[in-house]
């Protein structure tokens, strides 16, 4: 329990725009997902193997229906080496994406 609480503190990103799954330990760091009404999710991770994780920075992936997508105007890959402010900006961009056509 103490390790989980510590991970949550280290992995806190304040965003008031999404349904947030609580941060949970992931590898030797943490992961949190922000899901928006448009069906998209921002998957945010930080651990020693993530892009920028060893420098205390974040990696973010754009997901839809639980799968990473590579065809959004935001990026065609995961975004590494992101500061907390960068993550907030990307999450706002994900929130603004139109729903995907079925």
What are these regions (language model features)?
Residues 2-102:
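Catalytic phosphate/metal-binding cores of nucleic-acid and nucleotide-processing enzymes, i.e., regions
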